[in-house]
């Protein structure tokens, strides 16, 4: 029987097959698409693996009579002889049954039922004589034919895929003991924790698909399902909705629209199939793992338990896994997988740490000015045009190129002589993504305009000032403020705590007397007109006259102007409310001080961001403007997202394609190998040893200053800069380290040594070793040629950016 292609997540992939599956369609359908992973979909299915292992335990023979566990298969008589053998039946076709010990002594013949039909074949006898010798005589082999199975060829073939029932706890232990890709498993555990259980995850995905279907379906109905000519002709005085609906409007849609709707239907079908596979083979097994091994019986507890507690319980299971156990196989020289809080965060954040470093080291230059559209420059952040659309394209092009299918850094990227070839290939990826974005741009723009309209209209109707007065952090700020090894839920919590103090800091700066006075006048006039129209509508309303439909101007009724002036009044009132509240606070009995510098310092307690260029300038409007680029108005962020749908192809083609060489150089220079962990970002290891910093920054130091002009002060300054994740000296790495210890309660939990590190003496590595780390002392530098990961594409972009990040 051919092997099933839906392999387990713990089986290693074939490199050649993965390279062949790297097709154009696999790139189009995007991350985790069913097309991209159907041939190598990674499941947690211990039952099928146990069945195969039981067959191999019987000796691995495909011959039916060679299995000692099948004691009731046939009756053997040693009196007959023949050279013929029964047809060979593969072990995969044997039905799994519990083993029953024989009732007679081993080697004797069990009694033959009188009414049982006998089918005989000549085959060599393998019986055991009374003296213990193996009989080599040829015997007449008799096969007992069951009543339900008509023929010999189907006698021992299972009717369906046989599964061995495994108790829940043993199933979870089997899952944990047979992990091969630890990065993926830990990411699945964290995804389950952040998703708050299997039902919340599944329902969230269903809601996302339903939202996508509704937006496309409702837009199609409004475009081709309503007869607007009949409504505008006014030939009939009374019309209902049923009179305006066009029956079978899909058949009358343009051919291009039908093609797009057909592709959309296929995409939704694939997403549903993928959701089923994830629920059946991944989420269910992860839920069982949480319940049986992590002692979390209900998913509701995931909302109250901390991630640090889960990490602590996970570390207690390390001796049950052959990859992480250090108490067994003491003579095994193979590296063991490291498992503590720092290593778990490094595995989950392996890819994101590189993006954080790329942005904080200013390797990615995303500044983009539009000479012909200079009016948009105040709206766009010209220093860094990073939106969700561009961020998704960056991950698409970089992740699937730099990292392989196992989540490790591709060894080819770490070789100097491959630099030019890899830079050209990465540049080609950026240009291909630009072309695809340009082709899909018209459809994506329409989709996102409708999506934002449907989403924010209700919020605008309830609170019109919310879209103008509210602020949020931009995508560029999120990557700029994020620490190394900081998991998303820690980062979201930190940003949410900073929003209140950030608004307080911005509101302390004066808005300008001219703007405030004009807004006060507009608010008064709009409120007065709205009040008069509402009172007149209530006074003149009767059965014969309707003031709401009275046309104040041509084709514009009183209700229309009430909506317009009411909106203006609400927006201006919301903008003036901040100044009023600040004045009331100043006049209240409690002391209130206008101190922007102290307010910004309080904000930095949550953001951990205060560059050296802000020193002694915290009270200035210049610093306030730079901070507003990070903490921008919500309406500006939405406009940037819509404009980026058009600008992303040009940024990918002209900006990022020319920086592909710098990206390759950065990954090669700032990747360090850690024994038991693999290649990780240098800054994520929190290694503050001088020798490592000098080694990692050697090339940059040579470019900055020649050795003949170096002084001791220069060495100290450059050493301080090398500690940072950014060149402006804001101590990115040390802040990440301190916050990491704070997030995991204490130092012992975060950097708990493994049993191996407690037993072995601490030995110093040779100076300049790239593997030297505070958390690991015996590194073995080795290079593993792992299969290159599959590529993904941008077609999934139609539903990637409309949903907020989980938990935000």
Swiss-Prot record:
It is found in: Preautophagosomal structure membrane; Cytoplasmic vesicle membrane; Golgi apparatus membrane; Endoplasmic reticulum membrane. It is a multi-pass membrane protein. Phosphorylated by ATG1. ATG1 phosphorylation is required for preautophagosome elongation. It holds the Pfam family ATG9. InterPro entries: Autophagy-rel_prot_9. Keywords: Autophagy, Cytoplasmic vesicle, Endoplasmic reticulum, Golgi apparatus, Lipid transport, Membrane, Phosphoprotein, Transmembrane, Transmembrane helix, Transport. Residues 434-454, 634-654 dip into the membrane without crossing it. Forms a homotrimer with a solvated central pore, which is connected laterally to the cytosol through the cavity within each protomer. Acts as a lipid scramblase that uses its central pore to function: the central pore opens laterally to accommodate lipid headgroups, thereby enabling lipid flipping and redistribution of lipids added to the outer leaflet of ATG9-containing vesicles, thereby enabling growth into autophagosomes. This is Autophagy-related protein 9.
């Amino acid at each position: 029987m051919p092997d099933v292609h839906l392999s387990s997540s713990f089986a290693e992939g074939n490199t050649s097959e993965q390279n062949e599956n790297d097709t154009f369609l696999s790139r189009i359908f995007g991350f985790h698409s069913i097309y991209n992973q159907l041939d190598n979909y990674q499941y947690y299915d211990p039952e099928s693996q146990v069945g195969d292992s039981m067959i191999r335990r019987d000796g691995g023979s495909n011959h039916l009579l060679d299995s000692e566990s099948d004691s009731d298969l046939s009756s053997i008589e040693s009196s007959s002889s023949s050279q013929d053998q029964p047809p060979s039946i593969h072990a995969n076709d044997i039905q799994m049954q519990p083993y029953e010990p024989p009732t007679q002594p081993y080697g004797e013949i069990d009694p033959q039922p009188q009414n049982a039909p006998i089918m005989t074949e000549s085959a060599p006898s393998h019986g055991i004589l009374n003296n213990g010798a193996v009989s080599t005589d040829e015997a007449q082999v008799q096969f007992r034919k069951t009543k339900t199975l008509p023929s010999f060829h189907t006698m021992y073939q299972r009717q369906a895929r046989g599964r061995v029932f495994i108790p829940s706890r043993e199933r979870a232990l089997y899952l944990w003991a047979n992990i091969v890709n630890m990065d993926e498993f830990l990411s699945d555990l964290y995804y389950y924790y952040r998703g708050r259980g299997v039902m919340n995850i599944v329902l969230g995905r269903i809601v996302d698909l339903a939202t996508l279907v509704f937006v496309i379906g409702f837009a199609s109905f409004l475009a081709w399902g309503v007869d607007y000519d009949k409504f505008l002709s006014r030939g009939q005085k009374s019309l209902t909705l049923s009179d305006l609906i066009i029956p079978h409007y899909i058949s009358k849609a343009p051919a291009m629209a039908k093609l797009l709707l057909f592709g959309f239907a296929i995409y939704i079908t694939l997403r549903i199939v993928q959701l089923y596979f994830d629920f059946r083979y991944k989420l269910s097994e992860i839920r069982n793992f949480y319940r049986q091994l992590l002692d979390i019986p209900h998913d509701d507890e995931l909302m109250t338990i901390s991630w640090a507690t889960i990490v602590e319980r996970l570390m207690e299971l390390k001796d049950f896994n052959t990859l992480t156990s250090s108490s067994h196989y003491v003579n095994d020289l193979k590296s063991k997988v490291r498992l503590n809080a720092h290593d778990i965060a490094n595995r989950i954040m392996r890819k994101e740490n590189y993006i954080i470093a790329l942005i904080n080291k200013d390797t990615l230059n995303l500044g983009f000015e539009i000479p012909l559209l200079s009016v948009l420059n105040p709206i766009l952040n010209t220093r860094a045009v990073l939106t969700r659309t561009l961020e998704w394209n960056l991950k698409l092009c970089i992740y699937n190129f730099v990292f392989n299918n196992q989540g490790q850094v591709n060894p080819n990227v770490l070789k100097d002589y491959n630099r030019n070839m890899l830079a050209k290939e990465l540049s080609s990826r950026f240009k291909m993504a630009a072309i695809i974005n340009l082709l899909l741009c018209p459809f994506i723009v329409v989709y996102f305009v409708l999506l934002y309209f449907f989403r924010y209209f209700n919020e605008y109707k309830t609170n019109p000032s919310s879209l103008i007065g509210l602020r949020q952090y931009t995508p560029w700020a999120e990557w700029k403020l994020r620490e190394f090894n900081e998991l998303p839920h820690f980062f979201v919590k930190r940003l949410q705590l900073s929003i209140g103090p950030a608004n307080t800091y911005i509101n302390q700066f004066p808005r300008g007397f001219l703007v405030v006075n004009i807004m006060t006048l507009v608010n008064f006039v709009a409120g007065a007109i709205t009040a008069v129209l509402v009172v007149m509508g209530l006074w003149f309303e009767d059965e014969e006259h309707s003031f709401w439909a009275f046309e104040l101007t041509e084709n514009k009724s009183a209700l229309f102007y009430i909506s317009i002036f009411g909106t203006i009044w609400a927006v201006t009132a919301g903008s003036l409310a901040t100044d009023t509240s600040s004045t009331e606070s100043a006049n209240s009995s409690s002391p209130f001080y206008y101190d922007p510098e102290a307010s910004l310092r309080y904000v930095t307690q949550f953001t951990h961001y205060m560059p050296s260029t802000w020193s002694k300038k915290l009270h200035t409007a210049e610093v306030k403007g730079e901070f507003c680029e990070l903490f921008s108005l919500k309406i500006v962020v939405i406009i940037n997202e819509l404009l980026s749908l058009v600008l992303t192809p040009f940024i990918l083609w002209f900006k990022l394609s020319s920086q592909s060489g710098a990206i390759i150089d950065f990954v090669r220079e700032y990747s360090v190998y850690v024994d038991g962990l693999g290649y990780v970002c240098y800054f994520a290891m929190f290694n503050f040893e001088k020798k490592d910093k000098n080694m990692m920054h050697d090339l940059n130091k040579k470019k900055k200053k020649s050795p003949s002009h170096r002084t001791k002060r220069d060495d100290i300054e450059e050493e301080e800069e090398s500690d940072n994740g950014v060149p402006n000296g804001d101590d990115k790495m040390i802040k990440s380290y301190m916050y990491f210890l704070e997030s995991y309660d204490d130092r012992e939990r975060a950097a708990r040594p493994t049993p191996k590190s407690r037993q072995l003496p601490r030995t110093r590595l040779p100076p300049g070793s790239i593997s030297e780390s505070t958390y690991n002392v015996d590194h073995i530098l080795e290079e593993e040629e792992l299969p290159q990961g599959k590529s993904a594409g941008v077609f999934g972009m139609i539903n990637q950016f409309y949903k907020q990040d989980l938990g935000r």
